[in-house]
């Protein structure tokens, strides 16, 4: 049997390098946008909650 491992390596690499890279890039961008959107929402909610609590605290201190 005359098998040259170099040829099979080239075939395997050419098929599998393109397929996962394209799919992982698509998943990656979807994950990035999902993660960014959720982190932005958490940041806004956290910041707004903090400001609201701070305002309530300051108003309560002024009443005393």
From Swiss-Prot:
Q: GO terms for biological process? A: neuropeptide signaling pathway
Its cellular-component GO annotations read:
extracellular region
Give the main localization category: secreted
Q: Where in the cell is it found?
A: Secreted
Q: Name the propeptide positions.
A: 1-6, 23-24
Please describe the organ and tissue distribution of this protein's expression. Answer: Orcokinin-3 is expressed throughout the central nervous system (at protein level).
Q: Which keywords does this chain's UniProt record carry?
A: Cleavage on pair of basic residues, Neuropeptide, Secreted
Q: Describe its function.
A: Myotropic peptides.
Q: Which family does it belong to?
A: Belongs to the orcokinin family.
What name appears for this protein in its UniProt entry? Orcokinin peptides
Organism this protein belongs to: Camponotus floridanus (Florida carpenter ant)
């Amino acid at each position: 049997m005359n098998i040259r491992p170099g040829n099979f390596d080239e075939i395997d690499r050419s098929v599998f390098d393109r397929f996962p890279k394209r799919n992982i890039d698509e998943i990656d961008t979807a994950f990035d946008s999902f993660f960014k959107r959720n982190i932005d929402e958490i940041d806004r909610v956290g910041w707004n909650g903090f400001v609201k609590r701070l305002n309530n605290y300051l108003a309560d201190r002024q009443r005393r």
